[in-house]
Amino acid sequence: TGGPGTGKTELIKGLEFKGFNCEHEIVRKITEEAQKNGVDQFFLKDPIEFSKRLMLLRLNQYNKIQNTKYTFFDRGVHEIIAYLNFLNIDFENKFFEQTKEIVYDYVFILPPWKEIYKNDNARYESYEESVKIYEEICDIYKLLNINIINLEKTTVEKRIATILKSIN
């Protein structure tokens, strides 16, 4: 995981290429669907409704993989809370309670990386905002006592090597 634009998607593609089970980011799917219906930034327009849909989809991702040795997620369930915190949005306690039920064996986090950061139709945040989101993500995992392993700003191959060393 990590803030926006840190190389998560490329890392997931690299792990998948090596034969690992991977669950891709689903925010783009929700955002693109909303854009087809005339809503440019669904998360900004209705963060709670967006988060409810996202929670359901991420919980489904998590629940379907329980019989695999390793599955890598582009993003975790807990990050829904991090994004709501980033926007200072009040949310139902149910969101937080649902995230407490999810435990990952490892959380690998990618740091903000200005040199590779770029905006697109689903990534609206500035680089500075992406740093704050990264901090919120770190905070939510720490709050829930979930250990995070920091990955370096380096090639996908070196990041994968660090991950494989950590899980073996």
Model-identified regions with their sequence ranges:
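P-loop (Walker A) phosphate-binding loop of NTP-binding proteins
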Residues: G3, L15
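Conserved glycine(s) of the Walker
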Residues: G7
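Conserved substrate/cofactor phosphate-moiety recognition/catalytic segment
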Residues: E16-L57
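Glycine-rich phosphate-binding loop used to anchor ATP phosphates in small-molecule kinases
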Residues: S51-I102
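A glycine- and Lys/Arg-enriched "phosphate-lid" helix/loop adjacent to the NTP-binding pocket
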Residues: N88-T155
